[in-house]
Amino acid sequence: MVQVSTHSATQSIPMEGEALKNWLQTRANQIIAGDRLSKQEALALTAIEGQENIFSLCEAADRIRQACCGNTVDLCSIINIKSGSCSENCSFCSQSVHHPGQDSPIYGLKSREEIVTHAKAAADAGAKRFCLVSQGRGLKYNSPKSQEFEEILATVQEIIETAKIKPCCALGELTLPQAQALKEAGVTRYNHNLEASENFYPNVVSTHSWQDRVETVKNLKAAGIQACTGGIIGMGESWTDRIDLAFSLAELEVESVPINLLNPRSGTPLGHLPKLEPFTALKAIAIFRFILPQQILRYAGGREAVMGELQNLGLKSGINAMLIGHYLTTLGQPPQQDQAMLADLSLIGGEAPIPGEYQPQQAT
């Protein structure tokens, strides 16, 4: 038993068996009804061990997902529009000029025609959103350069006009006017991850700060663009760091939360780390769902590499979105395989609701 304080009382959490399962189901019902998990409760849940007990946690998280988000799994795809020689020193990334990873591609901005062609292919594969991702610290620092930004805006508009898919962007840090320009061009969602907790962040990046990233998220929200903001699990951070990250995302009221599972890249400072254990990843996903009941939780990088044949379990542990197709510098599995996995789980690929949008169907 672990003694914790909830938002309304002090109680004990059993750590195994039927007692744990009953506590989790009761707490899930309370969260579905509008209560919120306390940080102390969340930290207590990290002590759950053993596959059967973790399955109980995942089952309760899945009930929250069904009740608060429904059975539609948000499908998106990405394209690396400019790669390599990045000025930043993110320890997990093979595109950094400080530690270029083995076999990491280096090229300038792709042509509008090539990007639009990929957008149409992503739509044909079932993706509902298509994210244009560029290396560099960000538009705020003229990276991509200003003329490249204008070309990206024009490309976004052409995707809207010619492809049956919604364009998103991930162009690094930006100012409020730059966010407003993206909004005017038709961008409704922008990816800018916090990557880690504020406490752990200096261990993986030193060329910019965690607060720099938070400022960009706030600029996005102020411009009326949905924030697709999450992080990476498996960089050597503690469970406290993971919980702190989740609560920071809740405080920022982001709409979509990519959960990346570190796939260590040779040549990077984190390349020596072991891959995350799949059940550790499942536990993290489930706890994130308890903390973020209405957010879109997105399987992102590392899904295939870390989860392997257990990928489907994430979709029954709180996940309700995923990238399909390839990632920035690594390959993903064929979209048809993802669609088959969803069908086996009686889930529907599409566009998931953002917080406050889901309306459960009323029985007639």
Swiss-Prot record:
One of its GO terms (biological process) is biotin biosynthetic process. It is an enzyme of class 2 (transferase). Binds 1 [4Fe-4S] cluster. The cluster is coordinated with 3 cysteines and an exchangeable S-adenosyl-L-methionine. Binds 1 [2Fe-2S] cluster. The cluster is coordinated with 3 cysteines and 1 arginine. GO terms for molecular function: 2 iron, 2 sulfur cluster binding; 4 iron, 4 sulfur cluster binding; biotin synthase activity; iron ion binding. Keywords: 2Fe-2S, 4Fe-4S, Biotin biosynthesis, Iron, Iron-sulfur, Metal-binding, S-adenosyl-L-methionine, Transferase. [2Fe-2S] cluster binds at residues 131, 168, 228, 298. Its cofactor is [4Fe-4S] cluster; [2Fe-2S] cluster. Pathway: Cofactor biosynthesis; biotin biosynthesis; biotin from 7,8-diaminononanoate: step 2/2. Gene3D superfamilies: Aldolase class I. Residues 68-303 form the Radical SAM core domain. It catalyses: (4R,5S)-dethiobiotin + (sulfur carrier)-SH + 2 reduced [2Fe-2S]-[ferredoxin] + 2 S-adenosyl-L-methionine = (sulfur carrier)-H + biotin + 2 5'-deoxyadenosine + 2 L-methionine + 2 oxidized [2Fe-2S]-[ferredoxin]. Its EC number is 2.8.1.6. [4Fe-4S] cluster binds at residues 86, 90, 93. Disulfide bonds: none annotated. Belongs to the radical SAM superfamily. Biotin synthase family. PANTHER family: BIOTIN SYNTHASE (PTHR22976), BIOTIN SYNTHASE, MITOCHONDRIAL (PTHR22976:SF2). Homodimer. Catalyzes the conversion of dethiobiotin (DTB) to biotin by the insertion of a sulfur atom into dethiobiotin via a radical-based mechanism. This is Biotin synthase. It comes from Microcystis aeruginosa (strain NIES-843 / IAM M-2473).
